[in-house]
Design a protein with these regions (language model features):
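N-terminal secretory signal peptides that target proteins for export/translocation
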Residues: 1-10
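Bacterial N-terminal signal peptides
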Residues: 12-23
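Mid-to-C-terminal alpha-helical segments outside catalytic/metal-binding sites
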Residues: 13, 30-36, 45, 49-68, ...
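An N-terminally biased module of ancient metal coordination in phosphate/nucleic-acid-related enzymes
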Residues: 28-106
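Active-site gating/metal-coordination segments in enzymes
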Residues: 31, 81-199
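Hydrophobic faces of well-ordered beta-strands that scaffold small-molecule active sites
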Residues: 34-38, 65-67, 119-123, 150-152, ...
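Acidic-and-aromatic substrate-binding clefts and catalytic sites of carbohydrate-active enzymes
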Residues: 41-49, 72-76, 94-100, 126-134, ...
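Catalytic pocket-lining loop regions of alpha/beta-barrel enzymes
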Residues: 112, 158, 165-294
Length: 351
């Protein structure tokens, strides 16, 4: 009898454990994503191609993507014996590359009519120091009527890439960009700007004025601040920017035209702590401004890690109220697009 009793108790415990696991899995949230920051090509203007992107989207519940090029091309210099693998691979410079938008346009135009509504092309192939760039963007809007749904990612302050790019250092508040912001407002286009909030070593918001001035001067232009001004390179020298949270809190209150892209360098060390748990202060900020944050993968031309990048936000999303989590995961990006853009609620790619 004691043996039978022990067996019954063991079976009961095993059954209870299975029920708890099942219940936990059943209650786990499933998200449909919009990737608000995806580069179809890399820094050599090469890509794994649309079939692989479509597969990655379908397999990972990524319904919509912002799709853009890379506004610079990395040079393989005459003096370099080996082709670099990344822009930081050697000291050769990068140069502004307008054909990146042609590559994106060609890829999107080859999609089927059923696939097209899930791709949202952004223009990026222009020199942000050139006051002719606004005219170039206008020409691209006319050459591809109805195609472009935003501008960016515009590279301004961008770590070592700033030093490697030929010409002057771009600023988000220069005259050339001012013309572009006016054009964006006239055409109802959001603008994604990469503008570092500080340098690698300064522990203060050294360059904040460069992004805050356009926000103040162009209230009718919708700005997506890429990575909230942070970068992986900054974090190599400064593990965490202590001033970032209070700065964002103030700016989101002051500028209703500011939206935050949480890709690349925001998940850690900001949204999640060292144990991978959501930070309460960041949850509170997103809850206070539930329509102002969006997710992105920031992949460049290769899509094998697309799902991993997007799903890595799940611990943070799970700690938010479900309605807010779905806004951040999918809806907020769609809401910032031009009113004329088709914002399909279907999930044809994920069936």
């Amino acid at each position: 009898m004691p043996t039978c009793r022990r067996l019954i108790v063991s079976l009961y415990r095993l059954s209870l454990a299975c029920l708890l696991v099942f219940a936990g899995n059943a209650s786990a949230r499933e998200y449909t994503y919009s990737d608000a920051h995806l580069h179809y090509v890399d820094f050599f203007q090469e890509t794994a191609g649309m079939p692989k992107l479509l597969t990655a989207m379908k397999e990972n519940s990524i319904e919509h993507v912002m799709i853009s090029g890379i506004p610079v091309a990395k040079k393989w210099h005459e003096d370099e014996p080996k082709r670099p693998r990344y822009y930081a691979g050697d000291d050769a410079d990068a140069y502004w590359y307008s054909a990146t938008d042609v590559i994106v346009a060609d890829a999107v135009q080859k999609l089927t009519p059923e696939q097209r509504p899930y791709f949202h092309p952004f223009l990026s192939g222009f020199n942000p120091n050139d006051k002719n760039s606004a005219a170039h963007i206008q020409r691209m809007l006319e050459l591809y009527p109805g195609l472009w749904q935003g501008i960016g990612e515009v590279f301004t302050r961008h770590d070592d890439l700033t030093a490697l790019t030929s010409g002057d250092t771009p600023r988000a508040n220069n005259e050339a960009m001012t013309k572009i912001y006016h054009l964006a407002a006239e055409n109802d286009l959001p603008v994604m700007v990469h503008s570092n909030i500080t340098s690698k070593r300064e522990r203060n918001p050294l360059y904040l004025q460069e992004i805050e001035e356009p926000l103040r001067n162009h209230p009718h232009t919708r700005f997506i601040w890429a990575h909230a001004g942070t970068s992986a390179e900054i974090h190599r020298h400064q593990t965490q920017l202590d001033f970032l949270l209070p700065t964002l809190t103030r700016m989101l209150e002051a500028y209703p035209n500011l939206f935050i892209d949480l890709s690349w360098s925001m998940l850690t060390p900001y949204l999640l702590d060292e144990q991978g748990k959501p930070r309460p202060e960041w949850l509170a900020l997103v809850k206070k401004y539930p329509e102002r944050f969006m997710l992105g993968s920031d992949v460049v031309g290769r899509f094998n890690r697309l799902g991993e990048e997007m799903h890595s936000f799940a611990p943070f999303l799970d700690a938010l109220p479900e309605e807010i989590a779905q806004k951040v995961a999918r809806d907020n990006f769609l809401a910032i697009l031009p009113r004329t853009a088709l914002k399909s609620g279907k999930t044809a790619l994920n069936r």
